[in-house]
């Protein structure tokens, strides 16, 4: 699942459109966070809502197969706050610093890393500019390939 800045809006969109996506577990976790934190549902109510969502929108859904997963997701959904970030602020100075590299591949990668660092800084006060994203994901998002 790609990085979602505003998980509340994304969850509302998923509910409206009934889109399970390529990673159903990620979708369910996002919906569980929404149900627990925005609609104030308890674990059991969240479990029922997720089960209902899957029955309605996931082809060949088998509740017995998904029961443990949905139960676990419903429990953990309150542990992680639902993100509601509308933008990541990038300054002209930061853009100028990146442009000084004078290599488009490096510039793309540095810009991507800056965005991730600022996102993680908004999510956690303790982050301090750290990027905890797989290097392959950074290259994919930056649309940069590496040749050996």
Model-based region annotation:
Residues 1-148:
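Modules that initiate DNA replication and primer synthesis
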């Amino acid at each position: 699942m790609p990085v979602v800045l505003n998980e509340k809006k994304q969850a509302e969109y998923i509910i409206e459109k009934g889109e399970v996506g390529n990673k159903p577990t990620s979708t369910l976790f996002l919906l569980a966070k929404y149900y627990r934190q925005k609609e104030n549902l308890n674990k059991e109510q969240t479990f029922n809502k997720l089960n209902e969502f899957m029955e309605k929108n996931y082809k060949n859904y088998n509740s017995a197969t998904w029961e443990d997963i949905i139960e676990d997701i419903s429990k953990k959904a309150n542990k992680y706050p639902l993100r509601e970030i509308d933008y990541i602020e990038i300054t002209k100075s930061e853009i100028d610093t990146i442009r000084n590299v004078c290599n488009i591949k490096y510039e793309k990668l540095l810009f991507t890393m800056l965005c991730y660092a600022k996102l993680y800084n908004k999510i956690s006060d303790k982050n301090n500019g750290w990027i905890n994203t797989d290097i392959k994901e950074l290259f994919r998002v930056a649309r940069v390939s590496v040749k050996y």
